[in-house]
């Protein structure tokens, strides 16, 4: 889930190389709606998005679906206050915005251990 078309297409390429299907939403509200319909195994969620930010969307999804595995993927995810809020809202991992296949596979492994 990312409002940037560049990062959505880049994410799709990496996720598909890992063997997963890729769906996207460009804002947090659509992310919540899409999660409710599709129930994906994993979600990569940007923090800074329009309408509903990724932290709010993460909290809404994890409140409704406690087993949701959300990986925050944001250029501000390394900032302590955002990391703390992401985990408090139910995220189970943080990825750098410029993640690669190895980063994704490691984050998925860690998410599987948490939830």
Task: Report each predicted region and the residues it spans.
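Two-component/phosphorelay signaling modules centered on CheY-like receiver
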Residues: 5-23, 89
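Acidic, metal-coordinating helix/loop segments flanking the phosphotransfer/catalytic sites
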Residues: 24-42
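Acidic catalytic/metal-coordinating carboxylates
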Residues: 27-30, 53-57
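Active-site residues of response regulator receiver
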Residues: 46
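Receiver (REC) domain active-site loop signature in two-component systems and cognate sites
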Residues: 49
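Alpha4 helix (beta4-alpha4-beta5 surface) of REC/receiver domains from two-component response regulators
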Residues: 56, 77-95, 106
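Hydrophobic/aromatic residues positioned on beta-strands within the core alpha/beta folds
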Residues: 73-74
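C-terminal output helix
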Residues: 99-109
């Amino acid at each position: 889930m990312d409002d940037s078309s560049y990062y959505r297409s880049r994410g799709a390429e990496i996720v598909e190389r890992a063997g997963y299907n890729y769906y996207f939403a460009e804002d947090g509200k659509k992310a919540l709606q899409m999660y409710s319909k599709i129930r994906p195994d994993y979600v990569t969620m940007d923090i800074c998005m329009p309408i509903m930010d990724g932290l709010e969307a993460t909290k809404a999804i994890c409140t409704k679906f406690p087993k949701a595995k959300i990986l925050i993927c944001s250029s501000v995810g390394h900032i302590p206050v955002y990391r703390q809020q992401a985990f408090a809202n139910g995220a189970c991992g943080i990825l750098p915005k410029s993640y690669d296949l190895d980063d994704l596979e490691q984050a998925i492994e860690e998410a599987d251990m948490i939830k």
